Amino acid sequence: LISGNGANVGYIHYYKGKFNAYQRTYVLDQWQQNIIFIQYFLEQFLKERIYGEKKEGNTPYIVLSTLSEMPLLLPCLEEQTKIANFLSAIDQKIEVVAQQIEQAKTWKKGLLQQMFI
C-alpha cells in the first residue's frame, strides 16, 4: 500500500490479507517480483521522487504516473529474495534492540525515582 495524499503522502506499508483501500491509496498487488524487496526499494527511492513531483494544494498528493513511470532496477528474483530476507532480519534485530533500549530507560527511571525518595 502506498499513501497517495495527505501529510503521509508516500508512506509505504506491506500488508497481507484483506483490507479496505480508499481513494488515493495505491495497492501494488500484481507483481511477479519479491514484494518485500519492492517495499525496501520504494522506501529508499520513492520519497525523493515524490517530493520532486508531488502536487500542492490544500492537501499534498501524488498521481499514478509518479509510481508507474518510476524506473525499477530489479535483480533476478532469487537475488531479490536474498536481499529482502537480509534486510528483514536486520529490521527485526533493530526492533529487538529498540525494545531493549526502552526497557533500560524504564529501569533507569525507576532507579532514579528510588534514589530521590
Give, region by region, the residue ranges found by the protein language model.
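Short, ligand-facing micro-motifs at secondary-structure edges
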Residues: 1-20, 35-40, 48-54
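Amphipathic alpha-helical coiled-coil/heptad-repeat segments
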Residues: 73-117
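Short, solvent-exposed alpha-helical surface patches in well-structured domains
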Residues: 37-40, 69, 79-82
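Residue-level preference for alpha-helix termini and adjacent loops
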Residues: 1, 11-14, 18-21, 60-61, ...
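A short glycine-rich beta-alpha junction/loop motif
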Residues: 19-25, 55-78
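Extended Lys/Arg-rich polyanion-binding regions
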Residues: 28
